[in-house]
Amino acid sequence: VGHYHAEPGVISYSGIPEFEFNLRLAREVKTHLETNGLQVRMIGERGNLIFLNHRTRAAQGADLFLSIHHDSAREYLLPRREEFAGFSLFISRHNPHAAKSLACASAIGAALRAAGMTPSRYHADPVIGENRPFADELNGVHFYDNLGIGKAAKMPSVLVEAGVIINREEEARMNDPAVRARIADAIARGAKQCLK
């Protein structure tokens, strides 16, 4: 579960902390992964696990580290918030299993697209604080080499930004239980496919 109570991430259009979105989606992903026969270890569910090294240590022995988040945009871009929507997936080339991370991220992105979701493109834009090159443009996967969790994990690692919650319409979609279930199912199907 991305973020924690003391640092809850971005605040959505309607004022809900990102951590709440992350927790709901992570629980749904867990259910779908278990339904697909995979074992899941939830990390950060109580909102008190602060340090990245504690999170990756808690994941020791896992085949894949998924970090569930919801997206925003740089502060100077907030007046254009309604332009930003879609999912993004991030991997680090500094992860010791970068090729497997990319394979898993691509599988998750393909499953999200098959479920009707659209990848966000703005992280690849040449603007301050972004400029994250595509690793797999079709499936919304970006390289983010200095991503803390991506570098720290000792197993393949994918950070999922499920949607842009500063966008009013996208926040409403992320709050829709049917949409959340579709996203969670797609993440689980992609993860299962890459772990075969």
Predicted segments, located by residue:
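Short glycine-rich His-centered loop
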Residues: V1-G15
